[in-house]
Amino acid sequence: MAAMTVQLDIVSAENSIFSGLVAHLQVTGSEGDLGVMPGHAPLLTNIKPGMARIVKQDGKEEVFYLSGGILEVQPSSVSVLADVVKRADEIDEKAAEEAKRRAESAMADAGADFNYAAAANELAQAVAQLRVVDTIKKNIAR
């Protein structure tokens, strides 16, 4: 018996990153982790910066970094629309660590005209990228 699948499209502002049949998608929604499988109820929600983990039709896993965006679930398709999408192997770990350090430093030395929301967003994106890198390292070590 063939595995149940749903059509998934992951697109960024620049291009389509993934299009294919998947058995499972996991993203970080606005209310926490969200798993989507074939037959999921229709849904439209914000997604936070974090990891998107997919299990493809053949059972292989693929991991992406999403800067945040929108998740739309329809009966026969799922769409992820994000400003920035990176495959796990495209993430520059050193740059993400530096961005995290800069954001933490800026938040610690905040002045009166400091944009806390922008710094918190930069920190969340850097931490999310580092989590994706860490997940990949753990999977390789298995």
From Swiss-Prot:
One of its GO terms (molecular function) is proton-transporting ATP synthase activity, rotational mechanism. It is a peripheral membrane protein. Keywords: ATP synthesis, Cell inner membrane, Cell membrane, CF(1), Hydrogen ion transport, Ion transport, Membrane, Transport. GO terms for cellular component: plasma membrane; proton-transporting ATP synthase complex. It holds the Pfam family ATP-synt_DE_N. Signal peptide: none annotated. It is found in: Cell inner membrane. Produces ATP from ADP in the presence of a proton gradient across the membrane. F-type ATPases have 2 components, CF(1) - the catalytic core - and CF(0) - the membrane proton channel. CF(1) has five subunits: alpha(3), beta(3), gamma(1), delta(1), epsilon(1). CF(0) has three main subunits: a, b and c. Belongs to the ATPase epsilon chain family. This is ATP synthase epsilon chain. It comes from Shewanella woodyi (strain ATCC 51908 / MS32).
